[in-house]
């Protein structure tokens, strides 16, 4: 049992490294204008995370459109705004499919 747990930890570490490599490649391809290739890299990274039953890293999760799956580059194919109407939050709009993602901002309690 201990051997299996050690193997799982090692394989999850390898999977996390592969996800980081794929997301860096997706960022490069999206910067150069090859959006289809970057979508494929994002999809591969998601499949690896699902197969290993591990959560997708938060730093990369916010850079992916949940509707069309494209890699978001702020200012190029995504618009970022801060709003404080009902509650303070960041609004990220994908300019390819016009989907909106809202991320709440934690405020310090008085």
Curated annotation (Swiss-Prot):
GO biological process, one term: tRNA 5'-leader removal
Cofactor note: Binds 1 zinc ion per subunit.
Domain of life: Archaea
Thermal properties of activity per the entry: Optimum temperature is 36-38 degrees Celsius in the absence of L7Ae, 48-50 degrees Celsius in presence of L7Ae.
Cofactor names: Zn(2+)
The keyword Repeat belongs to this UniProt entry's keyword annotation: no
Keyword vocabulary terms for this entry: Cytoplasm, Endonuclease, Hydrolase, Metal-binding, Nuclease, tRNA processing, Zinc
Function recorded in the entry: Part of ribonuclease P, a protein complex that generates mature tRNA molecules by cleaving their 5'-ends.
Family, as annotated: Belongs to the eukaryotic/archaeal RNase P protein component 4 family.
Official protein name in the record: Ribonuclease P protein component 4
